[in-house]
């Protein structure tokens, strides 16, 4: 290396040019190529190429179907679609929110509390634990939970060996025409979690949770590498002209892009009518289940009418490297975010 004044100036110039190139137009393109390399067709696990390890590849699936109001039929459909996802190479399979029956929250009816079951001894969870072990897949299982005198909209996280890794209870509970969940569900008390499964550390939010960026960020801060959102969203009974499906997708695409993690959303399809205290309420569910990549791009998308199984593969090591390169977690300023702990935006 040159050591005189001229040599030092030359070295400094070269260093600055390299730095400029790193910050300029070429760098985002390189990052985008890195992310795109992390998305592919399903296979799962680590693979060897030319004798070397190429990354931790995980295949995820979202399934969607129309629910009847017969629990056994819906659980059988969920199992059939999970098996189909497994045949397509999926390691983690997401089924929609409260898939055991119709979305009963359209009405406020005391008899619907009979649908709630404890987590322990829950026949649907036990059945899907056996399936998870048989297929070696991870299954987040949505269900209406009874816990003594409390009731929750919950997900049990079943690992690939059938182990129940624990619960997440829905934190944000909506209350509006057709979506009267506050009548049935206590606000969740688990907090946001990251679950370490055989294939990846995952975060799971439930439906209305998906509208809150704090939920996604909290899970990723705890190490979640993929976000999952079981959902029940459709038309608004009070306004037939209101269609939020594109807004719904864009919000979650933002979570994926802001946190540089893949995201999986599973929604039901079909038209469901529920007897209410004042007559009937009907919702047509949007479907549009999707899988987003770590820059927010949709890589798989279902329509609004058909039963579907979506599968996509991601290289989590590649994505992790890209996430580090962007520095979004390095440059966070938690000391400035105290206002997020308030409702009115006023610092105490």
Predicted regions and their residues:
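Short amphipathic alpha-helices and their capping/turn segments at secondary-structure boundaries
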Residues: 49, 76-93, 214-221
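Intrinsically disordered, glycine-rich low-complexity segments
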Residues: 27-38, 46
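C-terminal beta-strand edge segments of enzyme domains
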Residues: 3-6, 18, 38, 44-45, ...
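Short beta-strand scaffold segments in enzyme catalytic cores
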Residues: 141-143, 154-157, 193, 289-291, ...
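Short, glycine-anchored, charge-dense loop/turn motifs used at functional sites
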Residues: 60, 157-165, 290-299
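Beta-strand-turn-beta hairpins that frame and shape the catalytic cleft
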Residues: 51-60, 194-203, 226
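CN hydrolase (nitrilase-like) catalytic-core segments centered on the catalytic cysteine
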Residues: 117-139, 207-309
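Cys-nucleophile CN-hydrolase/nitrilase-fold catalytic domain and related Cys-dependent amidase chemistry
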Residues: 2-3, 71, 80-171, 176, ...
């Amino acid at each position: 290396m040159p050591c005189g004044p001229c040599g030092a100036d030359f070295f400094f110039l070269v260093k600055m040019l390299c730095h400029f190139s790193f910050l300029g137009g070429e760098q985002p393109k390189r990052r985008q190529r890195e992310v795109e390399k992390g998305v592919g067709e399903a296979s799962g696990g680590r693979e060897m190429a030319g004798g070397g390890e190429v990354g931790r590849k995980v295949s995820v699936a979202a399934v969607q179907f129309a629910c009847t109001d017969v629990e056994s039929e819906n659980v059988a459909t969920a199992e059939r679609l999970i098996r189909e996802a497994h045949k397509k190479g999926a390691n983690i399979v997401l089924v929609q929110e409260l898939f055991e029956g119709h979305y009963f929250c359209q009405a406020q009816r005391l008899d619907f509390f009979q649908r709630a079951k404890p987590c322990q001894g829950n026949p649907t969870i036990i059945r899907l634990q056996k399936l998870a072990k048989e297929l070696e897949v991870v299954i987040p299982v949505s269900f209406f939970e009874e816990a003594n005198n409390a009731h929750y909209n919950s997900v049990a996280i079943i690992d690939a060996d059938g182990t129940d890794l624990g619960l997440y209870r829905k934190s944000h509970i909506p209350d509006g025409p057709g979506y009267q969940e506050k009548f049935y569900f206590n606000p969740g008390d688990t907090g946001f979690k990251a679950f370490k499964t055989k294939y990846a550390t995952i975060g799971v939010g439930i439906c209305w949770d998906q509208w809150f960026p704090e939920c996604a960020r909290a899970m990723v801060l705890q190490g979640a590498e993929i976000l999952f959102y079981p959902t029940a969203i459709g038309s608004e009974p009070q306004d037939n002209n209101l269609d939020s499906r594109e807004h719904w997708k864009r919000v979650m695409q933002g979570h994926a892009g802001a946190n540089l993690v893949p995201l999986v959303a599973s929604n039901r399809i079909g038209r469901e009518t529920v007897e209410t205290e004042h007559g009937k309420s009907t919702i047509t569910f949007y479907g549009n289940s999707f899988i987003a990549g770590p820059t927010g791009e949709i890589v798989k998308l279902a329509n609004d009418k058909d039963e579907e199984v979506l599968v996509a593969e991601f290289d989590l090591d590649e994505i992790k490297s890209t996430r580090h390169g962007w520095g979004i977690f390095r440059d966070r300023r938690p000391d400035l975010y105290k206002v997020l702990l308030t409702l009115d935006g006023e610092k105490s």
